[in-house]
Amino acid sequence: MKLPGIVTPLIAFVAYAIAQATPNYTSPLDVDIYNPSQLFNVSGPWSLMSRAGNTLYISGIRGFYPSNTTLAPVGRERVLQAFLNMKMLAELGGSDLTSCLRLQVYVTDMYRWRPLVNQVQEELWKDVAPSYPPRTILEVQRLNDDDIVEVEGTFYLGD
């Protein structure tokens, strides 16, 4: 699998961020809300992930580079970056791809982007799991900033 050249420096950046991971807020019912600004800056009134019990919920993530928040080039690289961003958040929250319970993918053109989503998912999961998590892929009219793909995931954290 060939990954963009930004991945190596990004791994060091993420390792630092993981060490710093603490919830931004914990609700009275023990739901932890995370908004790790050292990785991503959110663009509205939402958070990147939450943890309730042994389940981690990651909000819709797009294909931008965390180091400078610019979008990856349109096409395969952007789809890959969206999945890598979700993967980084899962790892930050204490999980990984092998513990993905469910994926939801939004694309603006099923015909153009679904094959790339399938290709990227096959590449990322081929060495980590014997099968793939349940996934729903939906075509939507428009995404934030006229993007082409957004990925969200639910992950198991163990007992």
Across the structure, where does each feature detected by a protein language model lie?
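N-terminal presequence-like segments and the immediate start of the first folded domain
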Residues: 3-84, 88-93, 98-101, 107-159
